[in-house]
């Protein structure tokens, strides 16, 4: 797609975002820079991407009839899934029956909507190294799986994100509570889970991998710190050996080549010395990649927009995306119930090498990521400290 129309006209190039969170918001902004007509959909009103889209829709995207009706009415040129909780079989059928273009492909959306599809592809079809694992449906299978993979281990619903339903089991005392949380915390309610054995790794990375008209390109590796299964900080570049980086790129290319299509993929990997293990992949921008808003000339969102529109992504020789220097991000979390408001914004931005993104989440119930601070410095450690200081300066209030 190299001819782009004018939004809100008969020539418009229309893109439908399925999921309208903070990552979708940044994708929508990048698409609008190219005059794309953006339609945002999600299960709740006033989601972040809806605030910058040409129009929006609220629906249950796990309902195939509602999803098909939306697509029939909007007639998008591209469908861009931004979350996992979508009736992907409907997308597969539409791609097969009507030639509907799903990014990167409907098959990729289906395989990555839950952990089972992508883990079986990576480990059993492609033979990529992974942690030991078992899939379970019942509490009896769950206990057998723990016995098989050993403690410590991790249990996750096959369909969840941002750490929801995920627990780390370090002793037998954790077993019952972890099962209960896995059955209540996933996106699709009670059901199938994965039990994963621990890997003794040095660090985790996200390798942002872009499939585009000119081939496959890679961003510098992103290191990250998680708590309760959810991203708290990320930084770029993550130092690693040349051998580990080559192996990471080989694994990323193997999985993204199999998934196919065009767009940006977030490939999560465990690294120990020169050894690398595949963890997960998202066929869309990744939350740890928010750091690229300041660390790269083209952010992960700009790269995704360019790739899906068939435009050059500005890769250097060797397929590496240009990086702007050591950078870091720190997530802003709100706890409680209400509509978020932010104080001390000027203080948070006092350092000229810091930036701030407030997502526009309409409400917090419990705990929610509502923004991110970003920083550049002469080293990754200094950038991380700047991002933390900026985050600590902000005060988040929840208003009734």
From Swiss-Prot:
Q: Which domain of life is it from?
A: Bacteria
Family assignment from sequence similarity? Belongs to the PurK/PurT family.
What EC number(s) does this enzyme carry?
6.3.1.21
Q: Where does ATP bind?
A: 115, 156, 161-166, 196-199, 204
Where along the chain is Mg(2+) bound? 268, 280
Pathway(s) the chain acts in = Purine metabolism; IMP biosynthesis via de novo pathway; N(2)-formyl-N(1)-(5-phospho-D-ribosyl)glycinamide from N(1)-(5-phospho-D-ribosyl)glycinamide (formate route): step 1/1
Q: Which InterPro entries match?
A: ATP-grasp, ATP-grasp_carboxylate-amine, ATP_grasp_subdomain_1, PreATP-grasp_dom_sf, PurT, PurT/PurK_preATP-grasp, PurT_C, Rudment_hybrid_motif
Describe, as the record does, how this protein assembles with itself and its partners: Homodimer.
Annotated Gene Ontology cellular component terms: cytosol
**Positions annotated to bind N(1)-(5-phospho-beta-D-ribosyl)glycinamide:** 22-23, 82, 287, 361, 368-369
Asked whether the keyword Protein biosynthesis is assigned, the reply is: no
Which gene holds the coding sequence for this protein? Answer: purT
Listed under catalytic activity are: N(1)-(5-phospho-beta-D-ribosyl)glycinamide + formate + ATP = N(2)-formyl-N(1)-(5-phospho-beta-D-ribosyl)glycinamide + ADP + phosphate + H(+)
> Which protein are we looking at?
Formate-dependent phosphoribosylglycinamide formyltransferase
GO MF annotations, alphabetized: ATP binding; magnesium ion binding; phosphoribosylglycinamide formyltransferase 2 activity; phosphoribosylglycinamide formyltransferase activity
The organism's taxonomy opens as: Bacteria, Pseudomonadati, Pseudomonadota, Gammaproteobacteria, Lysobacterales
- Keywords from the named record: ATP-binding, Ligase, Magnesium, Metal-binding, Nucleotide-binding, Purine biosynthesis
The ATP-grasp domain sits at 120-309
What single Pfam family name could you report for this chain, choosing any that match? ATP-grasp
Q: What organism does the record attribute this protein to? A: Xanthomonas axonopodis pv. citri (strain 306)
Keyword Metal-binding appears in the UniProt entry: yes
- Matching Gene3D superfamilies, A to Z? 3.40.50.20, ATP-grasp fold, A domain (3.30.1490.20), ATP-grasp fold, B domain (3.30.470.20)
Question: What does this chain do?
Answer: Involved in the de novo purine biosynthesis. Catalyzes the transfer of formate to 5-phospho-ribosyl-glycinamide (GAR), producing 5-phospho-ribosyl-N-formylglycinamide (FGAR). Formate is provided by PurU via hydrolysis of 10-formyl-tetrahydrofolate.
Q: Which GO terms describe its biological process?
A: 'de novo' IMP biosynthetic process
């Amino acid at each position: 797609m190299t001819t782009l129309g004018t939004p809100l006209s008969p020539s418009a190039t229309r893109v439908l975002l399925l999921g309208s969170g903070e990552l979708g918001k940044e994708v929508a902004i990048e698409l609008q820079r190219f005059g794309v007509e953006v339609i945002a959909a999600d299960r709740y009103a006033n989601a972040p991407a809806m605030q910058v889209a040409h129009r929006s829709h609220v629906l249950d995207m796990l309902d195939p009839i509602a999803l098909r009706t939306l697509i029939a009415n909007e007639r998008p040129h591209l469908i861009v899934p931004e979350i996992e909780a979508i009736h992907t079989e409907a997308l597969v059928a539409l791609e097969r029956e009507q030639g509907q273009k799903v990014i990167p492909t409907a098959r990729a959306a289906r395989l990555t909507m839950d952990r089972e599809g992508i883990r079986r592809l990576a480990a059993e079809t492609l033979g990529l190294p992974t942690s030991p694992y078992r899939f379970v449906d019942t509490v009896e299978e769950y206990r057998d799986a723990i016995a098989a993979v050993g403690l410590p281990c991790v249990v996750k619903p096959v369909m969840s994100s941002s750490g929801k339903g995920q627990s780390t089991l370090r002793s037998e005392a954790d077993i019952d509570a972890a099962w209960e949380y896995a059955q209540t915390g996933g996106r699709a309610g009670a059901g199938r889970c994965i039990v994963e054995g621990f890997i003794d790794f040095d660090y985790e990375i996200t390798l942002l991998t872009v499939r585009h008209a000119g081939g496959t390109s890679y961003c510098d590796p992103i290191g990250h710190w998680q708590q309760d299964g959810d991203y708290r900080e990320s930084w770029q570049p993550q130092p690693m050996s040349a051998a580990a980086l080559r192996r990471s790129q080989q694994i990323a290319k193997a999985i993204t080549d199999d998934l196919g299509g065009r767009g940006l993929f977030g490939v999560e990997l465990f690294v120990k010395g020169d050894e690398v293990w595949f963890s997960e992949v998202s066929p869309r921008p990744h939350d740890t990649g928010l750091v690229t808003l300041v660390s790269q000339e083209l952010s992960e969102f700009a790269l995704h927009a360019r790739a899906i529109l068939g435009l050059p992504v500005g890769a250097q020789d060797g397929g590496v995306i240009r990086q702007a220097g050591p950078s870091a991000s720190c997530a802003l979390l709100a706890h409680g119930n209400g509509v978020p408001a932010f104080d001390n914004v000027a203080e948070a931005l006092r350092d000229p090498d810091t930036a701030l993104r407030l997502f526009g989440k309409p409400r917090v119930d419990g705990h929610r990521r509502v923004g991110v601070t970003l920083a550049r410095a002469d080293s990754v450690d200094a950038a991380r400290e700047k991002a933390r200081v900026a985050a600590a300066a902000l005060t988040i209030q929840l208003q009734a």
